[in-house]
Structures are given as C-alpha cells and as structure tokens.
Amino acid sequence: MDQNNSLPPYAQGLASPQSAMTPGIPIFSPMMPYGTGLTPQPAQSTNSLSILEEQQRQQQQQQAAAQQSTSQPTQAPSGQTPQLFHSQTLTTAPLPGTTPLYPSPMTPMTPITPATPASESSGIVPQLQNIVSTVNLGCKLDLKTIALRARNAEYNPKRFAAVIMRIREPRTTALIFSSGKMVCTGAKSEEQSRLAARKYARVVQKLGFPAKFLDFKIQNMVGSCDVKFPIRLEGLVLTHQQFSSYEPELFPGLIYRMIKPRIVLLIFVSGKVVLTGAKVRGEIYEAFENIYPILKGFRKTT
C-alpha cells in the first residue's frame, strides 16, 4: 500500500508542506542563515508615530513655558506688588454634600433698626415733655447761705447734697451744687431751658457770688406721643428681643433700645410711646419714624 494512502485525510496536508503553505511566504529551516528568508515589510501605520511625536513636542513646549514663568516675575503695574509665582485663583466652593462653615460673602451681624421708607410717614409729631441741661457757674458756692436767703429753695444735706430751687416762669427746677455746677430740668423747649438756667444764675449772683454762665449744654430730651391704636407687646418682644425687654410684673411698658439713633423708647399697650435719651430734637423725630411701622405691624385687631 502506498504511504500516502495510509495516512488519514486530515494528515495528508501535513505530509506535503509545500502544498499547504501560502504561496509567496518562504519556509524557514533550522539550517537557514538568520535573516536570509526575511523580506522587509513596510510599517503598517505611520499615524501612531506622528501622534506620539506631536504629544512629546507639546509636553516639551509646556515644560519650557512653565520654567520661564517661574524664573521671571510677572510685571505688575506701578504701586502693586509683583506676582512671584504662577498660581491659579483659589476657589472656596464647598464639596458636594457638605455645608460650608462660613457663608460667602460674610454679612455683618451688627444690629440695625429697620428704617421707615420716605413714603410711609406717620404724620405724628412727638411733643417734648422735659429737657435736662447743665451749666457751670464757675465759682464755689455756700449752699446754706443760698438756702436761707433765696426764696423757693430747700436744702437737706442728709438727703441730697444740693440746693433745690424752683421758679414759675419757665416752670422748672434747678439742682445747685457747692462746686458751682447746676442742673436744670422741666423745660419744654431748648429756649426755655436756657432762659431758666440764666435766671437761676442771676439769683445766685444777687446773693453775692461771682457766678458766670459757662458751658451750657442739653444732656437729655424726653418726648411722647400716641399712635392711636393698641399694641401687642408680647409679639413685639419676641420678634425684637435683641432690642427690647418686657417684664409686665415689674413695669407695664416695653423698653425698646434703638441703635441708631441711640434712643430708648417706652412702649405701652395703649399705644402711648415715650422717647428719651436724645441730645437734639431731630433724634426724637427720627426714632419715632423708625419705630412707627414696627408698631403698626403689631397692632391689635380686637
């Protein structure tokens, strides 16, 4: 039997390697010198090499630019500090799911009393009830002599170390101290307070003291008004607890301390308002215009 016929069909192709190989491709043999059967093949793709070369070139350019920026400081305009390092603007955006510790931008916590818009004028003018002023008579005084010789004067050193003197026009009261200082209270206007202080100084002069009229100054002004509606003081103190205090068992009025102007207001449930602590008349008017819309918001409906 022939040798080729004894092989199975799938092995017959292996017996003739020349017929099984692809034509044009050389068959390598262990005895063949290295490289004799190889033919140089062209590169399959030149695009990949060009892309790599381009990326390397860009990286080199970026490194060179970074070295130049760090070696040379940025030229700043006159009057400003030059930037020595190349840096990016830092952002303080919070991470997702976290709460920032400080709000941006940070707002001041200074308490401010809400002001009244110009279109919401109350139409109410507070009336001055009392003005306290001080004056220096510029000399030492013998209070016993003043109390004995002056009319409408009383002096009790065990109770109060000053002479209490009163006049009818303007209807005021003066506290005269041995140092020469005098306090005048009870006037309804600035002019009346100055006139009353001059009358007291004239009385002291007539008693033989070299009194002068120095450093007259208004220390406090008190005004009052009525808003004509009842006020819910409990709601007001809860909403404005930073400025107000309300203890009905101790005092029936709500004490409201305004920041600007620095005025203290006594607010009563009936709608009466007392303003004190002003140095000039305009501060009382401004404080009432500021508080009026607040009181209007807490008006009792029943």
Swiss-Prot record:
Disulfide bonds: none annotated. It holds the Pfam family TBP. Its main location: nucleus. Residues 57-101, 109-119 have a biased composition (Low complexity). Residues 1-22, 53-122 are annotated as: Disordered. Sequence repeats lie at residues 128-204, 218-295. Keywords: DNA-binding, Nucleus, Repeat, Transcription. InterPro entries: TBP (IPR000814), TBP_CS (IPR030491), TBP_dom_sf (IPR012295), TBP_eukaryotic (IPR033710). GO terms for cellular component: nucleus; transcription factor TFIID complex. It is found in: Nucleus. One of its GO terms (biological process) is transcription by RNA polymerase II. It comes from the Eukaryota. SUPFAM superfamilies: TATA-box binding protein-like. One of its GO terms (molecular function) is DNA binding. General transcription factor that functions at the core of the DNA-binding multiprotein factor TFIID. Binding of TFIID to the TATA box is the initial transcriptional step of the pre-initiation complex (PIC), playing a role in the activation of eukaryotic genes transcribed by RNA polymerase II. Belongs to the TFIID complex together with the TBP-associated factors (TAFs). Binds DNA as monomer. Belongs to the TBP family. This is TATA-box-binding protein. It comes from Craspedocephalus gramineus (Bamboo pit viper). The gene is TBP.
